[in-house]
């Protein structure tokens, strides 16, 4: 039987090699070995995704590579999902997070990773998908009364819609009842401060840690 480090390395390699089958194999090996799915995802898949993201930023990999890596990660997580749900059922939910890619933006890679990691961390995650209308975020926030409403923007042209969300949550009279988080490649702490968002998620891990801290406070 493969050891823990070996399985984690295989999970990471499956992402950097864009290999969905290998990602599923690593996940199955992890389950057989009784490993914690969170470890496999954080140290294996997410570490691989981080590497791919860095290479993409440096211009050595391109969008099709990032998409292929994201598909491999998705394939691996799907295998681990039932075990994660089982473990999650035994623990209390930390809070509810509504997440989606903002209106006009069809990119979902970063958002998908954050949603997966929040799920793993023990949050109830309502993923609205990509290119989500502002009014949908507001309606869902009214209906579900979440702790956090998180939006991702991958383009400077769609970032402005994060301002619209802040405004419309205020108009609906619920801005004071939820905390907002913004993230995405062009988004910065300065932007979050400027529009009045509560949290800026620089990376998936950063987003999870800050959401945990925000809910405790």
UniProtKB/Swiss-Prot annotation:
What are the recorded Gene Ontology BP terms? methanogenesis
Family named by the database record: Belongs to the methylamine corrinoid protein family.
Q: How does it assemble?
A: Can form a complex with MttB.
Going by the UniProt record, its keywords in alphabetical order are: Cobalt, Metal-binding, Methanogenesis, Repeat
What protein name applies here? Trimethylamine corrinoid protein 2
- From what organism does this protein derive? Methanosarcina acetivorans (strain ATCC 35395 / DSM 2834 / JCM 12185 / C2A)
NCBIfam families from the UniProt entry:
pyl_corrinoid
Q: Name one GO molecular function term.
A: cobalt ion binding
What is the stated purpose of this protein? Acts probably as a methyl group carrier between MttB and either MtbA or MtaA.
Q: What is the lineage of its organism?
A: Archaea, Methanobacteriati, Methanobacteriota, Stenosarchaea group, Methanomicrobia
Chain residues that bind methylcob(III)alamin: 107
Asked if the Swiss-Prot or TrEMBL record annotates the protein with the keyword DNA repair, the reply is: no
Identify the pathway: One-carbon metabolism; methanogenesis from trimethylamine
Q: Which residues form the B12-binding domain?
A: 94-217
A Pfam match: B12-binding_2
Q: Entry's Gene3D superfamilies? A: Cobalamin-binding domain, Methionine synthase domain
Q: Where is the B12-binding N-terminal domain?
A: 1-92
């Amino acid at each position: 039987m493969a050891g823990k480090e070996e399985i984690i390395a295989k999970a990471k390699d499956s992402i950097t090699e864009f290999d969905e089958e290998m990602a599923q194999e690593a996940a199955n090996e992890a389950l057989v070995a009784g490993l914690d799915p969170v470890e496999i995802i954080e140290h294996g898949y997410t570490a691989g995704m981080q590497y791919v993201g860095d290479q993409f930023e440096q211009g050595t990999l391109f969008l099709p590579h990032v998409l292929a890596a994201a598909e491999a990660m998705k394939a691996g997580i799907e295998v681990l999902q039932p075990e994660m749900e089982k473990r999650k059922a035994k623990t209390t939910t930390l809070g509810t997070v509504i997440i989606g890619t903002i209106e006009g933006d069809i990119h979902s890679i970063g958002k998908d990773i954050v949603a997966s990691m929040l799920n793993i961390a023990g949050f109830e995650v309502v993923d609205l998908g990509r290119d989500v209308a502002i009014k949908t975020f507001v309606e869902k926030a009214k209906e579900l009364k979440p702790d956090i409403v998180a939006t991702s923007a991958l383009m400077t042209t769609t970032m402005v819609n994060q301002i619209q969300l802040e405004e419309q949550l205020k108009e609906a009279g619920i801005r004071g009842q939820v905390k907002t988080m913004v993230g995405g490649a062009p988004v910065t702490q300065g932007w979050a401060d400027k529009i009045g968002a509560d949290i800026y998620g620089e990376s998936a891990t950063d987003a999870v840690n800050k959401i945990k801290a925000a809910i405790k406070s």
